[in-house]
C-alpha cells in the first residue's frame, strides 16, 4: 500500500496503468487479494500480462475461470482490466466472452509471430476481421 500511495502522490499528468504479471503467481495472488487498494489509490485500470514470453500465453498462467473471477472482482470495484500476454487469434472467442476493457496483441500481429519484428498488415487485417465476425 505504501508503494501505491507513493506512486499516486507523484501526480503524473498521464494516468498510470499497473501491469500485473500473471506468470508470477505470488504477485498475481497478492494483487487479487488486494484489488481494493488499487481503487483506494484511485487507479482506474489494470493490465494482466505475462512477464516471460517463453513460458506461454496468458491462458497457460491463468484458467478461464480465474480470469473470469478476476474480471468480476475488478468490475465490482469500478476498475477496468486489460488482458495481454502472447495472445493468439484463436483465443479471441474466449477473450470476448470475458469482456475485458482491452485485449492486447503483439506477437500475434508481427511478422513470423516475433514480437520484435515488424507489424504484419495481413495479420492485423485478419485479427480485425476475426473480431468483426465474432461480434456481428
Kindly label every feature range from the protein language model.
Residues 1, 45-55, 98-124:
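Glycine-rich phosphate-binding active-site loops on the catalytic face of alpha/beta enzymes
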Residues 1-60, 66-80, 90, 127:
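Conserved anion-binding
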Residues 64, 89, 117-121:
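Electropositive phosphate-/nucleotide-binding environments in soluble metabolic enzymes
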Residues 128-136:
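Extended, intrinsically disordered, low-complexity segments
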Residues 82-87, 105-107:
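Glycine-rich beta-strand-to-loop/alpha-helix junction loops that act as flexible
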Residues 60-61, 82, 114-118:
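Gly/Pro-rich active-site loop or hairpin
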